[in-house]
Amino acid sequence: MVKGIFITATGTDIGKTYITALIVKKLREFNINCGYYKAALSGAERIDGKLIAGDANYVYNIADIKGDPNDAVSYIFEQAVSPHLAAKLNNVEISMEKIKKDFSYIKNKHDYITVEGSGGIICPISMGKEKIMLENIIKSFKLPAIVVADAGLGTINSTILTLQYIKEKNISVKMILLNNYNHEDIIHIENKRYLSDNLPIPVYTCNKNSNNLEIPAEKLIEYYEEI
């Protein structure tokens, strides 16, 4: 049985792709066949006339996954806007059926699958014929989540609000990961202490520009669930 997890965040440009890549890299270095999938990607780069799914390409490079990164993304858009707006601008109808089919294909090639979200947890994927929010994908895949948050000022508010929204949607959260953490920054230190003391889930940190997660692979795989 394949096991999976979903990586979401408190907002855009928090570092989901960076953290996702480090998680997949850690597991693959532990000889675990871990793959990657993303339903919709915006802000793709066009090279020689072809759109390149930058987030997937980054994860594939860091985690040493073979193959075409574009195969790990169902919908790829050039405009750096929300997926629902990108789809509208390109006259594309996003389909949950295609997302499920593509996810199933990628999932069945691996023992573990790490799914990256788009933007923060409240992200419209499609407002066309099908109304699809990010949480619809998470629940459809039956995945627990990891929430990536910035370690700096304001993260207590954004993290707790994100967790409240996720709880309302009946999605399980396994841990919080504070990105861009500085062990000498009093704000970062206090944010971690407060969240650790007031949340029922573990709070981990990742130093800025780190090439490795300090979380052991054995601990990471405990957060993945059978899907």
Curated annotation (Swiss-Prot):
This protein's species is Clostridium botulinum (strain 657 / Type Ba4)
Q: Return the protein name.
A: ATP-dependent dethiobiotin synthetase BioD
List positions binding Mg(2+).
Answer: T17, D55, E116
- Which BP terms in the Gene Ontology apply to this protein? biotin biosynthetic process
Entry's Gene Ontology molecular function annotations: ATP binding; dethiobiotin synthase activity; magnesium ion binding
Which reaction(s) does its UniProt entry say it catalyses?
Answer: (7R,8S)-7,8-diammoniononanoate + CO2 + ATP = (4R,5S)-dethiobiotin + ADP + phosphate + 3 H(+)
Principal location: cytoplasm
EC number(s) on file: 6.3.3.3
- The entry marks the following residues as binding ATP, namely D13, I14, G15, K16, T17, Y18, D55, E116, G117, S118, G119, N179, N180
What gene is this protein a product of?
Answer: bioD
Q: Short name of one Pfam family for this protein?
A: AAA_26
Protein residues bound to substrate: S42
Pathway entry = Cofactor biosynthesis; biotin biosynthesis; biotin from 7,8-diaminononanoate: step 1/2
The entry's keywords = ATP-binding, Biotin biosynthesis, Cytoplasm, Ligase, Magnesium, Metal-binding, Nucleotide-binding
Q: Which residues form the active site?
A: K38
Compartments in which it is found? Cytoplasm
Which cofactors, if any, are listed as required? Answer: Mg(2+)
